Amino acid sequence: MPLALYLDDCADDDTLAALLCQAGHRVHTPRQAGISGALDSDHLAYAVRHGYTLLTKDPGDFLDLHTHWQTLNRAHSGILLIYEEKEVSKNMSRVQIVAAIENLLASGIAVANTIHILNQWR
């Protein structure tokens, strides 16, 4: 089942967005929303308001936001984290990101109200 994905500022990339669309996902970016450069909390609120699962390369801040939202009993459509390595050659490629999302979805594990580290789904 394809996802409605919101790529935050850190993950906003035209090529990645195109690959995700080709894989059947609906993709929205901060540029399209007119909120580029907004606070991470605003990006998450936007994603929630519009039913998007958030995709980010800023795991630390969104782990904290997820925990904070849990304490407030607030729901979200899921947060997908990508950890970047100091050695750039070890970073996930755009194709690997799309494949990791497909692997996660194929597992049947719930996405809503959870955090998933895509690096583990390569």
Where would I find each of the regions flagged by the language model?
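Alpha-helix N-cap/helix-start capping motif
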Residues: 10, 14, 59-60
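Acidic, PIN/NYN-like endoribonuclease modules and their adjacent C-terminal/linker elements
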Residues: 2-4, 8-9, 16-22, 35, ...
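Conserved BB-loop
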Residues: 26-38
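Conserved glycosyltransferase catalytic-site signature
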Residues: 40-41, 59
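Acidic, metal-binding active-site segment of PIN/NYN-like and related structure-specific nucleases
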Residues: 48-65
